[in-house]
């Protein structure tokens, strides 16, 4: 056995579990026809007031992307903060450079008006 066999076994098992979980709904689902009422949007027993697939303003998507980017930034800070006493000066300054790049990006987004809701 090579040293990569546990990784291969893990990948095969995860593929099998994924395929089983994808196939189970097709096995247990009923083949009854769907009614138009089941496909329509539910609004507390009333007829729908508008289209259920209304458009969102692009700013919502922009704010969500910015949140994801800066939320991932925090995941880099946790291991750095935990191992701060074990890393040397290079690790400290590399994280400061990372923080500087993110701060410049945040200031650029702010300057361009990506965070303004006018």
Swiss-Prot record:
GO CC annotations, alphabetized: mitochondrial membrane; NADH dehydrogenase complex
Catalytic activity: a ubiquinone + NADH + 5 H(+)(in) = a ubiquinol + NAD(+) + 4 H(+)(out)
Enzyme Commission number(s) of this protein: 7.1.1.2
Localization terms from the record: Mitochondrion membrane
Sorted UniProt keywords: Electron transport, Membrane, Mitochondrion, NAD, Respiratory chain, Translocase, Transmembrane, Transmembrane helix, Transport, Ubiquinone
Residues annotated as transmembrane: 7-27, 62-82, 87-107
GO molecular function term, any single one: NADH dehydrogenase (ubiquinone) activity
UniProt xrefs under InterPro entries: NAD(P)H_OxRDtase_bac/plastid, NADH_UbQ/plastoQ_OxRdtase_su3, NDAH_ubi_oxred_su3_sf
A Pfam family recorded for this sequence: Oxidored_q4
Entry membrane topology: Multi-pass membrane protein
Main localization of the protein described in the UniProt heading: mitochondrion
Disulfide bonds: none
Gene3D superfamilies to which the protein is assigned, alphabetical: NADH:ubiquinone/plastoquinone oxidoreductase, chain 3
Domain of life the protein comes from: Eukaryota
Family: Belongs to the complex I subunit 3 family.
Stated role: Core subunit of the mitochondrial membrane respiratory chain NADH dehydrogenase (Complex I) that is believed to belong to the minimal assembly required for catalysis. Complex I functions in the transfer of electrons from NADH to the respiratory chain. The immediate electron acceptor for the enzyme is believed to be ubiquinone.
The protein, known as: NADH-ubiquinone oxidoreductase chain 3
């Amino acid at each position: 056995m090579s040293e990569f066999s546990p990784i291969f076994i893990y990948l095969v098992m995860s593929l099998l579990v994924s395929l089983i979980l994808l196939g189970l709904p097709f096995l247990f689902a009923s083949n009854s026809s769907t009614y138009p009422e089941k496909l329509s949007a539910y609004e507390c027993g009333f007829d729908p007031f508008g289209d259920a697939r209304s458009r969102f303003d692009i700013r919502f998507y922009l704010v969500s992307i910015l949140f994801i980017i800066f939320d991932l930034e925090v995941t880099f800070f946790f291991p750095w903060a935990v191992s701060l006493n074990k890393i040397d000066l290079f690790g400290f300054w590399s994280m400061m450079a990372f923080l500087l790049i993110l701060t410049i990006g945040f200031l650029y987004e702010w300057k361009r008006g990506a965070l303004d809701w006018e």
